[in-house]
Each structure stands twice: as C-alpha cells, then as structure tokens.
Amino acid sequence: MKKIVSLALTTVFALGAFTGCTGEQINSVALTDGTYRAEFVEFDTNGWKDYVEVTVVEGQLDQVVFDSVDKKGNLKSEDASYKAEMEQMVGTYPAKYNKDLINQFLESGKITAVDIVAGATESTGNFKTLIIEAMENATTGNTEVEIVENIK
C-alpha cells in the first residue's frame, strides 16, 4: 500500500513539475537531441511490457512511439489476434489507441490534455506515466533507458 501511494504521489509531482515546465506547449521546453525510452520494469499479467520512446532532433520532438513488447520481442500493435479480440470486445485496439494518445499529446503539447481513450483506460494511464519519464530525460539529455515501476 505504501508503495502504491508513493508511486501515485511521485507521478502527481512529476506530472506537475513537467507540465509546469512546459507551460502551454511542448516546444517551450528545451529538449536535447537524442532518443529517450521509458519502460515498465515488469511484464503485465498478459505478458506485455509497455514502453514509450521519444526522439528529439534539432531540439524538437521528431517521433513518439508507444507500444508494448512481449518476452519474444513481438509488438502488441502488430498482434493480429490480440487486435481482433480487443476490437470486438471494446471497439479499439493497440495500434489505434496508441496513435490517438500520441496525437493528443503532440497536438496539445501537454500531458494533462491527453484524454482517456474509451476501451484503453489502463493503457492511457501507462502512456501518461511513461511519457512523463521520457520527456523529463529529454530535457536533461539522459539517454539511459528509464525503468519505471509498473502501475498496480
């Protein structure tokens, strides 16, 4: 319980600190060229590990990737059976909601403006947690993979 509260508070403070730095737009923050990755420490109960990878070129966001990988290195966004099952059950699937989350972030320039995607509530929270970590590293130039405690 203590761990959950600690993680929640850390996320809230990090979100506040990062969004405070960005003001209204991402591009108001000085970003260091490089590729920055944040990923969860553990695979989830379904065998996936979420990650975000941000690439900065000439001080600007060039690319943002949000996906999940299994122990064999397969991407969730490319798993056809997972897509079919999820789309039938909740009306969305990883490649679709990943793109939506990334576009919301890039268009608004603010993590706090990213809305929950229906059918992908957990993934939305995971995206927000991981993008905060990746963007913080992009401001400091730390290109080491940021390992983040899974949200429980």
Each model region followed by its residue ranges:
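Positively charged n-region of N-terminal signal peptides that target proteins for export
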Residues: M1-I4
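Internal alpha-helical transmembrane segments of multi-pass membrane proteins, especially GPCRs
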Residues: S6-T10
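Alpha-helical transmembrane segments
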Residues: T11-L15
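C-terminal motif of bacterial Sec signal peptides marking the signal peptidase cleavage site
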Residues: G16-G20
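Bacterial signal peptide processing site
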Residues: T22-E24
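Active-site- and interface-proximal helix/loop "cap" or "latch" segments in soluble metabolic
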Residues: I26-K152
